[in-house]
Amino acid sequence: MANAASGMAVEDECKLKFLELKSKRNYRFIIFRIDGQQVVVEKLGNPDETYDDFTASLPANECRYAVFDFDFITDENCQKSKIFFIAWSPDSSRVRMKMVYASSKDRFKRELDGIQVELQATDPSEMSFDIIKSRAL
């Protein structure tokens, strides 16, 4: 399994779309999936989409990686933004799928320069809006 993980390729589109999210703010979120031996972009969220739109886009029974650009207001009333990396690994997904996603996560995350907060979730309650907000502050 480790050998397969170290050979996991990251499609250039993943890095390009992440740069667009980070610098141009073209997207609110990006959902990635492992397709064979590479990570590919599955869905791009428009800038006006909400956190609820994002969570609704994650499959209930399959693992995914995701990046979410979270806008918030600090206690000092300052507008801020943090980029979250979310490793979605629902309990109901297949064991092999969970292993592949877990073993490839760090390598994939290293390709995305600018991640500020990482979150691992096996259940929607582990990535609720309140949890995201508390991790951002």
Swiss-Prot record:
Presence of keyword Coiled coil: no
Name of the protein: Actin-depolymerizing factor 7
The protein's role, per its UniProt record: Actin-depolymerizing protein. Severs actin filaments (F-actin) and binds to actin monomers. Binds monomeric actin (G-actin) with a marked preference for the ADP-loaded form and inhibits the rate of nucleotide exchange on G-actin. Required for pollen tube growth. Promotes turnover of longitudinal actin cables by severing actin filaments in pollen tubes.
TM ranges: none
Boundaries of every ADF-H domain copy: 7-137
SMART domains xref list: ADF
Entries under InterPro entries matching the protein: ADF-H, ADF-H/Gelsolin-like_dom_sf, ADF/Cofilin
A Gene Ontology BP annotation from the UniProt entry: actin filament depolymerization
Recorded superkingdom: Eukaryota
Cysteine pairings via disulfide bonds: none
Highest classification ranks of the organism: Eukaryota, Viridiplantae, Streptophyta, Embryophyta, Tracheophyta
Compartment(s): Cytoplasm, Cytoskeleton
Species, as recorded: Arabidopsis thaliana
Entry's Gene Ontology molecular function annotations: actin binding
GO cellular component term, pick one: cytoplasm
Family, per entry: Belongs to the actin-binding proteins ADF family.
Residues recorded with modification Phosphoserine: 6
Keywords: Actin-binding, Cytoplasm, Cytoskeleton, Phosphoprotein
Tissue expression: Specifically expressed in pollen.
Pfam families: Cofilin_ADF (PF00241)
Summary of the knockout phenotype: Decreased actin filament severing frequency. Increased amount of filamentous actin and inhibition of pollen tube growth.
